[in-house]
Amino acid sequence: MDEQLKKVCQAFRLPGTYLGYEAIQVGIVNQTYKVNVRLEDGKEKSFLVQNVNTYAFRNPIGLMNNIDLVTEHIRQKCPEKRSLHFHHTEDRKTYLLDGKDFWRVMNYIPSATYSATTDPVILRNAGRAFGEFQAQLLDIDIDQLVETIPNFHNTRKRYDSLDEAIRLDAVGRLKEVQPEIDYLMKSRDAACLLTDMGNAGSLPRRVTHNDTKINNVLFDRDTNDSLVVIDLDTVMPGLMGHDFGDAVRFAANFVAEDSKEYDKVGIDLAVFTAFAQGFLEKLGTAMTQNELDTLAQSCFCLTAELAVRFLDDYLRGDLYFKTSYPAHNLVRARNQIALCRSMEAHMDEMNAIVHRCAEV
């Protein structure tokens, strides 16, 4: 691997003498390495070198074009803000295609990350980071960006796929999941609200991150201020509620998304409030009334959509999501359905919190 990484470093014209690398274990899609070099002045510097998974991302050049457009727009608009910097090859490309390998290199940013937290300061700063990310891109020409994963948050199509999985019952699991099917089918129109409003033009298209887990924000190690939003592979046109709803779905559940303790699943309103405060602080005045009015409901939409996807995969024999045991996807689906029920019970409170945060 050393020789391969040396070759990549040379192609991206990185300064200094190659010292070695560390494999970065966080992240399950791309292979990531922290490469260390010694500069002419004797100091050491680090870079992140990634081998992009071209099975997961079938249009990696389009993906990198999206990232280039977004990072350059942020850099031009807010030069004082930290942004991801991707290095260029001699022919000014931000990627290197070497046989079947698709490489890219970015600066390493010393920082802290969090997989989960209930700290309101960190949550508020995470919300602020994702809200600011969207705010910085409100005036970008969205038509320049490609849809790297077509229909990623098209909830109607996700339901269509579940309908097919139910008809096929490919591995004979249908008899186990009738209560889950009944709930999701009853919730179909409510779950598809964002998709339907987007298709009708009632919600504007935005540049969205589409993977708004809290661990995709880098934080200052001393102050816990947010530094930069990372993992831009899924940046593409979408709806504002996609990012807000998925962030809340992931961060504001009392338990992990694959916990079997369904009685403990629920929306943590303290976490929800902290994240909403940060998100709306940076974005509230730029939102349309429809966006604001559907922000709380977006959490239900994104949670139900994922429940549909988990159940779909379970009925097809666990072909998409990585599982650790035979019923893993069913447990995930039941967990997300329990979270949907909790959100339904607290939707009036969630709406009130959103509108209160928007007024500050």
Predicted regions mapped to residue ranges:
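ATP-dependent phospho-/nucleotidyl transfer catalytic cores
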Residues: 22-26, 50, 58-61, 112-124, ...
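Catalytic activation segment of kinase domains across protein kinase-like and atypical kinase folds
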Residues: 201, 215-254
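Long, compositionally biased intrinsically disordered regions
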Residues: 343-346
